[in-house]
From Swiss-Prot:
<dbReference type="GO" id="GO:0005829">
    <property type="term" value="C:cytosol"/>
</dbReference>
<keyword id="KW-0963">Cytoplasm</keyword>
<feature type="modified residue" description="Deamidated glutamine; by Photorhabdus PAU_02230">
    <location>
        <position position="204"/>
    </location>
</feature>
<feature type="region of interest" description="G5 motif">
    <location>
        <begin position="324"/>
        <end position="329"/>
    </location>
</feature>
<dbReference type="GO" id="GO:0007194">
    <property type="term" value="P:negative regulation of adenylate cyclase activity"/>
</dbReference>
<feature type="binding site">
    <location>
        <position position="43"/>
    </location>
    <ligand>
        <name>GTP</name>
    </ligand>
</feature>
<feature type="binding site">
    <location>
        <position position="179"/>
    </location>
    <ligand>
        <name>GTP</name>
    </ligand>
</feature>
<keyword id="KW-0013">ADP-ribosylation</keyword>
<feature type="binding site">
    <location>
        <position position="46"/>
    </location>
    <ligand>
        <name>GTP</name>
    </ligand>
</feature>
<keyword id="KW-1003">Cell membrane</keyword>
<dbReference type="GO" id="GO:0005834">
    <property type="term" value="C:heterotrimeric G-protein complex"/>
</dbReference>
<keyword id="KW-0132">Cell division</keyword>
<dbReference type="GO" id="GO:0005737">
    <property type="term" value="C:cytoplasm"/>
</dbReference>
<feature type="binding site">
    <location>
        <position position="327"/>
    </location>
    <ligand>
        <name>GTP</name>
    </ligand>
</feature>
<feature type="binding site">
    <location>
        <position position="48"/>
    </location>
    <ligand>
        <name>GTP</name>
    </ligand>
</feature>
<comment type="function">
    <text>Heterotrimeric guanine nucleotide-binding proteins (G proteins) function as transducers downstream of G protein-coupled receptors (GPCRs) in numerous signaling cascades. The alpha chain contains the guanine nucleotide binding site and alternates between an active, GTP-bound state and an inactive, GDP-bound state. Signaling by an activated GPCR promotes GDP release and GTP binding. The alpha subunit has a low GTPase activity that converts bound GTP to GDP, thereby terminating the signal. Both GDP release and GTP hydrolysis are modulated by numerous regulatory proteins.</text>
</comment>
<feature type="binding site">
    <location>
        <position position="326"/>
    </location>
    <ligand>
        <name>GDP</name>
    </ligand>
</feature>
Length: 354
């Protein structure tokens, strides 16, 4: 006699099939979802990488979004010129022309309007005269001795354009803005049939305790290092060299037991600034034992080795290193394409398909 299923049994089989199908779909979805954690010390370029993802994968910033950055551009410009003027007092540098002392006093009186997104012709004139001054330029050339925004010269050299009443920030202006990241900023985008979730975590020391719950199930970590930080100290601790701080943090991330299976991608960032700086500021400031030349290639390769040598699992764990300029969209696009290929390859390995 043939075996027939009762209605109840049939329903159970259908339920089982549906569960299997859902599990398979969930598995496929999980395989296509990529969680990227952006880590690195403060001001290493993490937030700029996030902005680039919006430009490359999400059609960039709309005109309305760009307009909202106007106040940040003005604030960054004002903060930069004020930082230089204050440093002149500390470094005992005089103005090239005595009349600039009056401009400096005016700057502090007029600065408030820029914080509201307005750059008056009077304020723009004051900043232009100060920026052209020989003493101000001498102080700017010693910016490693105090804290100064990387984009200072970018904005100050372009005051004629950004002080126009009808000024709307460009994509590049937006990329150059500096706002301290607090907490966790999450960005989503699709690329090469993968769904990316990127988490940008505040880099300053006070923010690091908030990172912990981001770590679980992460596909890859992109660790950003500012190459140009080799001769700078931390904003939070003037005794600590920024590059040494980055190495300490990278060591703790790279060798963490939670990240045994996690791909570690190292972005040695701000290569453009490093290439300029290494000509006049020797690498021995950071690495006294360094005996190589102060050429970009040799000095950059030495820093790369310092970081890669921190990996205590060389036999089983590879560090994928890229030299980047986070403000250069084409460079970031090229590098991120290579990063995605590594992620796809590693995903296939886990599935036994590579």
């Amino acid at each position: 006699m043939g075996c027939t299923l009762s209605a109840e049994d049939k329903a159970a089989v259908e339920r089982s099939k549906m569960i299997d199908r859902n599990l398979r779909e969930d598995g496929e979805k999980a395989a296509k979802e990529v969680k990227l954690l952006l880590l690195g010390a403060g001001e290493s370029g993490k937030s700029t990488i996030v902005k680039q993802m919006k430009i490359i994968h999400e059609d960039g910033y709309s005109e309305d979004e760009c307009k909202q950055y106007k106040v940040v551009v003005y604030s960054n410009t004002i903060q930069s010129i004020i930082a230089i003027i204050r440093a002149m007092g500390r470094l005992k540098i005089d103005f090239g022309e005595a009349a600039r002392a009056d401009d400096a006093r005016q700057l502090f009186v007029l600065a408030g309007s820029a914080e509201e997104g307005v750059m008056t012709p009077e304020l723009a004139g004051v900043i232009k005269r100060l920026w052209r001054d020989g003493g101000v330029q001498a102080c700017f050339s010693r910016s490693r001795e105090y804290q100064l925004n990387d984009s200072a010269s970018y904005y100050l050299n372009d005051l004629d354009r950004i002080s126009q009443s009808n000024y709307i920030p460009t994509q590049q202006d937006v990329l150059r803005t500096r706002v301290k990241t607090t907490g966790i900023v999450e960005t989503h985008f699709t690329f090469k049939d993968l769904y990316f979730k990127m988490f940008d975590v505040g880099g300053q020391r006070s923010e690091r305790k908030k990172w912990i719950h981001c770590f679980e199930g992460v596909t890859a970590i992109i660790f950003c290092v500012a190459l140009s930080d080799y001769d700078l100290v931390l904003a939070e601790d003037e005794e600590m060299n920024r590059m040494h701080e980055s190495m300490k943090l990278f060591d703790s991330i790279c060798n963490n037991k939670w990240f045994t299976e996690t791909s570690i991608i190292l972005f040695l960032n701000k290569k453009d600034l490093f290439e300029e700086k290494i000509k006049r500021s020797p690498l021995t400031i950071c690495y006294p034992e360094y005996t190589g030349s102060n050429t970009y290639e040799e000095a950059a390769a030495y820093i790369q080795c310092q970081f890669e040598d921190l990996n205590r699992r060389k036999d089983t764990k590879e560090i994928y290193t890229h030299f980047t300029c986070a403000t250069d969209t084409k460079n970031v696009q090229f590098v991120f394409d290579a990063v995605t290929d590594v992620i796809i390859k590693n995903n296939l390995k886990e599935c036994g398909l590579y």
